[in-house]
Swiss-Prot record:
Protein name: Phosphatidylserine decarboxylase proenzyme
Domain of life from the UniProt record: Bacteria
HAMAP family for the chain: PS_decarb_PSD_B_type1
Gene designation: psd
Function: Catalyzes the formation of phosphatidylethanolamine (PtdEtn) from phosphatidylserine (PtdSer).
Gene source species: Stenotrophomonas maltophilia (strain R551-3)
Pathway: Phospholipid metabolism; phosphatidylethanolamine biosynthesis; phosphatidylethanolamine from CDP-diacylglycerol: step 2/2
Residues forming the catalytic site: D88 (charge relay system), H144 (charge relay system), S247 (charge relay system), S247 (schiff-base intermediate with substrate)
Assembly mode: Heterodimer of a large membrane-associated beta subunit and a small pyruvoyl-containing alpha subunit.
Pyruvic acid (Ser) sites (modified residues): S247
């Protein structure tokens, strides 16, 4: 085990994340301005494409971090049969779910059942497709719909809060199936679709457009919310949720419905709205 991986295990994840949350929501201008200036400089954040490009106008760091983009900064792929990329970031991995397993990194994988919280939830995705998108601190942190879908259920799976940076992904076995996450099940024109919002070290929350804050509160058991019959439909490219700090979103598709855009591969930089896959 490398020193970096050992430190990843040793860090007090929840304490650090709780502290990060307090700082992110602080309206003390000395705190918010220092955090905004530090992150903007360190990660070369492009504020020109923000709906509000003035860093001094954000009352808290969290307002800055979850900032909206100006109209037209991202557009959906013109092909109406394209499923679109759900977020800005980088492809961590993508491919086929083989024997129920999802590839994480060299020598590392986890099962779809572990990720989703049950064998039953994973069955529709056997031999289907997965795409894992990592959002770095410099990226736009709202997650959008790859395809039009009606919300069926969410599953809050408690877990750890390991970093989801490249070193941790390479060094921590089954990382995405161990971190706290919100599994969002949708019914679409081609069948079921899942978007999984994975929490991480210093992630101070996940919010959805239909329910507000979902993570925290931190729990000790799997919590399901049934939305069937409530008519919560989100259009292709519409905002679905947001991270209150950088993390990862994983999209699962059932078998036989789509093929990934050929230019995509591990480590590909991606933007919200570009083609992720095309329906067959």
């Amino acid at each position: 085990m490398s020193l970096t991986t050992a430190l990843t295990y040793a860090l007090p994840h929840r304490l650090l994340s709780s502290m990060a949350r307090s700082l992110a929501y602080s309206d003390d201008p000395r705190v918010s301005r220092w955090l905004i200036d530090t992150v903007t400089r360190k990660f070369n954040v492009n504020l020109d494409e923000a709906a509000n490009p003035d860093p001094r106008s954000y009352a808290t760091f969290n307002q800055f971090f979850t900032r909206a983009l100006k109209p037209g900064a991202r557009v959906a792929d013109a092909d109406p049969r394209s499923l679109v990329m759900p977020a800005d970031g980088r492809i961590s991995q993508l491919g086929r779910i083989e024997a129920g397993r999802i590839f994480q990194a060299k020598g590392q994988s986890f099962t779809a059942a572990e990720l989703l919280g049950s064998d039953e939830d994973a069955k529709p995705y056997n031999d289907g497709l997965y795409a894992t998108v990592y959002l770095s601190p410099r990226d736009y942190h709202r997650v959008h719909m790859p395809w039009t879908g009606t919300l069926r259920e969410t599953v809050h799976v408690p877990g750890r809060l390991f970093s989801v940076g490249p070193a941790a992904v390479n060094g921590v076995p089954r990382l995405f199936a161990r971190n706290e996450r919100l599994v969002c099940h949708f019914d679409t024109s081609f069948g079921p679709m899942v978007s999984v919002m994975v929490g991480a070290l210093l992630v101070s929350g996940v919010e959805t457009v239909w329910s507000g804050e979902e993570i925290p509160a931190y729990g000790d058991r799997i919590t399901r919310k049934d939305y069937r019959g409530q008519g919560i439909q989100l259009e292709r490219f519409a905002e679905m949720a947001r991270f209150n700090y950088g993390s990862t979103v994983i999209v699962l598709l059932p078998p036989g419905v789509a093929e990934f855009a050929p230019q995509l591969g591990a480590e590909s930089p991606v933007q919200l709205g570009q083609a992720l896959a095309k329906l067959r």
